[in-house]
Amino acid sequence: MPNLKDLKNRIASVKSTRKITKAMQMVAAAKLRRAQESAEAARPYAERFNAVMAGLAASVGGSDSAPLLLRGTGSDQVHLLVVMTAERGLCGGFNSNIAKLARVRANELLAKGKTVKILTVGKKGRDAMKRDFAANMVGHVDLSGIKALGYANAQDIARDVLGRFDAGEFDVATIFYAKFQNVVTQLPTAQQIIPAAFEAEGESDEVALFDYEPSEEAILADLLPRGVATQIFSALLENGASEQGARMSAMDNATRNAGEMIDKLTIEFNRSRQAVITNELIEIISGAEAL
């Protein structure tokens, strides 16, 4: 039979844990609202930017004068995987799902004889990827000291990636992040950013409505680096909302599980205490009968 003191200590411990998880749930809920608003506010700009770039890219086509960021190196031998996760845990499967998608892609590429290089953004992604791909790691971006991610942070990451591309370190770059759907659903996503892969929305004839000065190629050469930064910034915002949604959901589950455990331990405590009282009564009655 469990010791009553041990049961009381366990109940007190679980109650303390429940207070912590409840507080974390409330903090995540507050952060989620801000992160979700930021992600949703950025989507129209990103979508419109994507549409403009798609039109420009379509007008240039496969021209030899097209910027290198658009036409690529002509090879897909070396791949850079930019794995974007959180700095902290306690957010369900958010980090592990992104890392899992990146690992699957890395293994597929390696099986095809491709060279894989990995750049991580966020501590959890680095920890997850280095277990299996330590030899493939080429860099890490630490965001632990940043309270609110901004476009400047995306520009820093973009400069790192673009610098590696200009140096001929890779042919194709893909970012991995979680696209926010709702509080309980965050979709692990892989998106190619180099060579630029823009998808046009609407009729393709819309491209002919615009005349560009000085030229499509010149405008693309200026906008494509910004496009990389914009895509990375969008991924950071989606990740931020997804992380808080996953943490809120995970802490809600933890709080409910703690409540159920407290109920079970309380029942066990009451039964044990009742058994102790019953035994004491039996001893008293037995002693009285002996007299």
Swiss-Prot record:
Coiled coil: none
Keyword Hydrolase: no
One biological process term in Gene Ontology: proton motive force-driven plasma membrane ATP synthesis
Keywords, alphabetical: ATP synthesis, Cell inner membrane, Cell membrane, CF(1), Hydrogen ion transport, Ion transport, Membrane, Transport
SUPFAM superfamilies: ATP synthase (F1-ATPase), gamma subunit (SSF52943)
Location(s) in or outside the cell: Cell inner membrane
Protein name listed in UniProt: ATP synthase gamma chain
